[in-house]
A protein has these predicted regions:
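Hydrophobic core of transmembrane alpha-helices in multi-pass small-molecule transporters
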Residues: 34, 115-133, 254, 331-345
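Helix-loop boundary and gating motifs at the non-cytosolic
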Residues: 10-73, 236-285, 349
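C-terminal ends and interior cores of transmembrane alpha-helices
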Residues: 97-114, 208, 315-327
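Cytoplasmic helix-loop-helix junction between adjacent transmembrane helices
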Residues: 122-169
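Intracellular juxtamembrane helix-capping segments at the cytosolic ends
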Residues: 47, 131-149, 267, 345-358
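C-terminal transmembrane helical hairpin of 12-TM major facilitator-type secondary transporters
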Residues: 307-350
Length: 423
């Protein structure tokens, strides 16, 4: 297999981001990787709507969503390690088959009134079998970047690639829920399960095909040696040192997850109290738009990693504090757009750092650990905000605390770096 060749150019500094994307991977990868992550964005809300529309209790519907989320959180690190050891195409193919089987079980349970625990178990299996397409895609960018012996070019590919993946994640989590809602309206509960299965086969199946054609795309290659050796001189190589460097980044990623979970739950509570529940989805979804745009553009900003993290935390703190005042819908929308920009920049910065620290051959595993931190953060934010209850003014407090925590982490890393330089 030939990995798409990264072409050199004297005008690298003036290359557009879009051109760099296409030169590095080609349009086939961009399309297949995007389609591969859509089922994960669609299935969770889709199952909630399927269960509730099938006449089952809302409590069961919520429990199914929780089962999918917990399954994903527990399964992601295992899936990531399997990707690194067995090859991405094999693991993704196996995960696709398991997810399809789980959807068949859910269809049978819904259509034949089988016990609730069967739906819960199938939902948990679906979550555990999530192929982590986003993490695999990020590992592909890492593999391509490490295949070049031009460090400046490699760094540009990583930054733009991580920006693109964040944009892809955010837009998929806007498109996915909208598509799930449309399916349930058009096809009903049983038809939606069938449609989810077909779309999962198509989306993840196309990604499997791309990965099978480029089978060694995420495996260590001889061409990476020079780039990796350059990185090793500047970054820790022992396991303990890598964990020490990566832990603050994972804390920030989890903090971003708290912002997502808190904001979604708080908006739901506010609009339910105001009698405008239909506004929750569009307003929350708009955060994904600015997150995607800024996430894609932020790698071009000539600002250091810790400064970006601190700036993102400050904006999150200010925006979440503003939302605690329960502003009007228009003002809330403006604040949400700013909040999206902050989390988009922060996520790209963090994922780029995770790639930088990950040892060769373990990039996918590192990315899935980071994604798991984000998922756990979402769950934590939703849980705490839900526990706050009907106090609309305190609903966004967990997100504000998370923003302050990001600033503290950035300052702590900066202080530690300063101490090292003095030694």
């Amino acid at each position: 297999m030939n990995i798409p060749v990264v072409r050199s150019s004297r005008a690298d500094s003036s290359d557009s981001s879009a051109r760099t994307l296409l030169e590095a991977t080609g349009p086939g990868f961009l399309m297949c990787a995007y389609l591969g992550r859509l089922p994960a964005a669609m299935n969770q809300l889709g199952l909630l709507l399927v269960v509730s529309s099938a006449g089952r209790s809302l409590a069961l519907a919520g429990a199914v969503v929780a089962a999918v989320g917990l399954g994903t959180a527990f399964g992601a690190p295992v899936i990531g390690r399997l990707h690194d050891h067995l090859g991405a195409w094999r693991v993704t193919c196996g995960a696709l088959l398991i997810q399809t089987a789980a959807l068949v079980v859910i269809w049978c349970a819904v259509s034949r009134a089988l016990p609730d625990w069967i739906i819960l178990a199938a939902g948990a299996v679906m979550g555990m079998a999530n192929p982590q397409a986003g993490s695999v895609a990020r590992a592909v960018w890492s593999s391509i970047a490490r295949a070049t012996d031009q460090p400046a070019r490699a760094l540009r590919i990583i930054r733009i690639g991580m920006g693109w993946e964040t944009a892809a994640d955010e837009t998929s989590f806007v498109i996915g829920p909208v598509a799930a809602g449309g399916l349930i309206s058009l096809l009903g509960a049983q038809g939606t399960v069938v449609a989810l299965g077909v779309l999962t086969l198509i989306g993840e199946g196309m990604f499997v095909i791309w990965l099978s054609i480029h089978r060694d795309v995420v495996r260590p290659q001889r061409g990476r040696a020079r780039f990796d050796s350059d990185r090793s001189r500047a970054h820790p190589t022992t396991t303990g040192a890598v964990v020490s460097e990566m832990l603050p980044v994972l804390v920030v990623i989890m903090g971003v997850g708290v912002v997502f979970g808190t904001t979604q739950t708080a908006l739901t509570s506010v609009h339910a109290a105001h009698g405008t529940p239909g506004l929750t989805g569009p307003i929350y979804g708009s955060m994904g738009i600015t997150s995607a745009l800024v996430g894609f553009a932020s790698p071009g900003l000539r600002v250091g990693r810790l400064r970006k993290t601190a700036l993102g935390g400050i904006v999150v703190l200010l925006c979440s504090s503003t939302l605690m005042g329960v502003p009007s819908a228009i003002a809330t929308e403006a604040v949400i757009l700013c909040l999206g920009a902050a989390v988009g920049m922060t996520l790209v910065t963090c994922y780029s750092r995770v790639e930088e620290l990950a040892p060769a051959g373990r990039v996918t595993g590192a990315m899935t650990v980071a994604s798991t931190g984000n998922v756990l953060g979402v769950s934590l934010g939703s849980l705490v905000t839900g526990a706050i209850g009907d106090n609309l003014h305190l609903g966004n407090l967990p997100a504000a605390v998370a923003g302050a925590g990001m600033v503290v982490v950035a300052l702590g890393e900066a202080g530690r770096a300063a101490l090292r330089r003095r030694r």
